[in-house]
Structures are given as structure tokens and as C-alpha cells.
Regions:
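Flexible beta->alpha loop and helix N-cap segments adjacent to enzyme active/binding sites
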Residues: 25-39, 45-68
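Glycine-/charge-enriched secondary-structure boundary and capping motifs
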Residues: 1-9, 58-63, 75-125
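Composition- and surface-driven signal marking solvent-exposed, interaction-prone regions
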Residues: 21-26, 46-52, 90-93, 102-104
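Hydrophobic alpha-helical scaffolding
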Residues: 1, 19, 41-44, 64-71, ...
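Phosphate/diphosphate-binding loops
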Residues: 1-44, 115-125
Length: 125
């Protein structure tokens, strides 16, 4: 946590505590898939992030949500995947982007990672 950082927490009822995940990366048989759910595709805003801090910068554009409906859809899909026990871990990308997220998950899971990111299809940013 960065000096001067504000921590905000929230509480929500969890009807089934067994249908939850933690941020530590778990890869049975040393294989797995990471899903990056972009709530604002094409907008890679890292202002105020750990990545900006590493480079002694503040950044000029902090993470934001352009279309609230995308958050609702992603939340609902995530809840279904949790019920189906498909997800094994979860983490946000707001504090350093995709790379920061993967590193934090690997550190928490006490494991290394090899990541292959395919090129996006034409027209997707």
C-alpha cells in the first residue's frame, strides 16, 4: 500500500461462503487460464496505480467505469461462475493493470507464471 493511500472497504451478505474465491493463484497440474474482464475496453488508465508509483509518477488518468451496465453484467456472470465452482481465484486490475494483477496473484499463490497473451481479433482494442 502506498503512503497516503485511502482504504475503503465494504460489507455484503454472502449466502454461501463456500462459493467464494481468494486472490492467490491456484493452478492444478501447473496449468490454468486467466480471464481478463475489461469493464472499459481500450481504456488503460493507470493513474495512481502501483505501476505509476514504481516509475515515480502519479499518472494523469485514474481507473474509472464508463458504462455501469458492463459492471452489472460482469458481476452477474461472475456470480454464476462462482456458483458453478468454475473460478478458483479472483483479483482486480486497478492497481497496476493486467501485469500487476498477475504478479500479485502469483506472489499470493507462491508460484511462478508463464503468460501467453494472444493478439486481439481485428477491431478489438
Amino acid at each position: 500500500m502506498a503512503p497516503g493511500a485511502l482504504v475503503i472497504s465494504a460489507y455484503a451478505v454472502c449466502p454461501d461462503v463456500t462459493a467464494t474465491v481468494t486472490p492467490d493463484l491456484k493452478c492444478p497440474n501447473e496449468r490454468g487460464s486467466l480471464l481478463w474482464v475489461q469493464l472499459s475496453p481500450g481504456r488503460h488508465r493507470l493513474g495512481g496505480s502501483a505501476l505509476a508509483q514504481v516509475f515515480a509518477q502519479l499518472g494523469d488518468s485514474c481507473p474509472d467505469l464508463d458504462e455501469p451496465g458492463s459492471l452489472e453484467s460482469a458481476f452477474n456472470v461472475t456470480q454464476e461462475l462462482l456458483k458453478e465452482r468454475v473460478l478458483t481465484a479472483g483479483h482486480d486490475v486497478s492497481d497496476g493493470g493486467f501485469l500487476g494483477c498477475v504478479l500479485e496473484m502469483a506472489f499470493a499463490g507462491n508460484c511462478g507464471v508463464t503468460v501467453s497473451v494472444p493478439a486481439p481479433p481485428p477491431g478489438v482494442t
